[in-house]
Amino acid sequence: EHFFYANPMEMLPRRSKDNPERNHLKSVRQQWYACSCCPPNIARTLAGLGKYIYGLEEDESILYVNQFINSEATVERNGKQYQVKLETQFPLNGIISITISGKDCSKIAIRHPAWSSGVKVKKNGREIFCERSESGYILVDLDTQEINRIDLEFQMEPIVIAANRKISYDARKAAIIMGPLLYCFESIDNGSEIEELGLYAQGELETKRNSIAGKEINTIYAKGTRRRELEGDTLYGVYQEMKEDVKLTAIPYFLWNNRGEGEMKVWIPVE
């Protein structure tokens, strides 16, 4: 019911509210905007969703699966017809099942996302070997039978990523992704003054199933630090190493600010 118009990589409410250059970045989700281009764009995208999920080779010999979304489709071309059913909990996990009913489809090409380092593929219950093509697809020859079922399990683990060196704002910082999802750190989980946090980029990452705003998600736990900066009225002082090890909690970015106003960061310094 509420959403963001802009999608900042960090939110420190006191900065946005008091800074004219940042006050367009809201610290709470909004119900409506004066310039509301998003709702019609969402409607347009959903109306054409089928063409984003599936595609056909020009000679119609190969069915392409581009997006992993629960769906059913009937393909009809030049007198040929078959049905496709895709079942998945993606992006909660990398398990996908595709059923093709009809003998008029001989091959299927399934997108192999760049974030996945490997995949297990089964055709009609038998594990088969498939390589990722240069174009990023897994090509499977279907058996000559009425119903074919392809089961895939893409490897999906949390990964620490870095930005290109030309993005100076993210220098010596890191972020966490899991599958296609970008993660963030919120103060409700990690405490206030979130700018004091650091991440052990080589540390072990743990995942645990959780729920936020009615959405089942994977929460990621990481090893990190909290630096204690100068307090009180002193503006400057002699530098002292004041930090402690802490356990960091990260949630999917698209769910931030569903538990009240607070601080948020995607990119945090590395230790």
Predicted regions span which residues?
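C-terminal beta-rich recognition modules with glycine/proline-rich loops and embedded aromatic residues
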Residues: 1-99, 133, 153-271
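Solvent-exposed beta-strand/loop surfaces of large extracellular or lumenal domains
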Residues: 116-141, 160-166
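Proline-anchored loop/turn motifs at beta-strand termini and strand-loop-strand connectors
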Residues: 113-116, 155
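Hydrophobic, well-ordered secondary-structure elements that form the walls
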Residues: 110, 150-152
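Short strand-edge motifs at loop-to-beta-strand transitions and within beta-strands
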Residues: 96, 136-140, 148
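Surface-exposed beta-strand/loop patches in extracellular or lumenal glycoproteins
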Residues: 99-113
